[in-house]
Amino acid sequence: MNGFEINLLGPSSKASLLAHSRGEDYTKYTKLSLTNGAGMRIAPVGCLVDWNDSEKLAETVARVSIVTHGTDVAIGGAAMVAQAVASGIGGRSWEEAAEDVLRIWNVARAKGEPTWAASVAERFRLALSVMKDFDDDEKFSRWVYDILGTGTMTSESVSAALAVAFYCRSAERAAIMCANMGGDTDTIGAMACAICGAFEGFDALPESRSSFLETTNALDFRAMAAEIARARTTFHL
């Protein structure tokens, strides 16, 4: 299945973009959007901003997200994904990156509309505290499914993606875990694999996997990465 030939819009994104197209007030949707549309598309932002510039990263995430997702949890959760990617590219260790990710939560969520959503940072902190007790992928996957949740809410899916990424530390392993987990598997997998890929690099993914994705979706991953790398040198707010 070609990913570009199916509807990739979630409920919040669809509602706000339709309002845009009709010239209506789209903020009545963005101020209430608790879903994961911002987080699922944010990884490239983590490629553009240095890992140690939290304010710039959070502000960039907010500006990119607010057209469809303007809440504290959506922006904060997306910033955590972007920060994990930025930290991976920046050569931080997994342990250092976890601290970076937790730190940016408060910086970023202050830029969104306040909501009643659960703290993604505290849910991620919980995952970090228990993952060392697991030595079986299926059991950890079940813990994520039962405790963090794998639904479309940012508080569930971003927490799940971060947990999977920091547990697996491998894009291929994370992809397999997410595909078998249940729930919003493609979104969680996209975020988790982007994070792992930032640490591992493209060559860590078996050629059979990457070539299948490129052929099926008519993509050239190396060319896309080169474009992002060039944009990194010229990007500014």
What are these regions (language model features)?
Residues M1-L237:
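Structured, active/binding-site neighborhoods that engage oxygen-rich ligands
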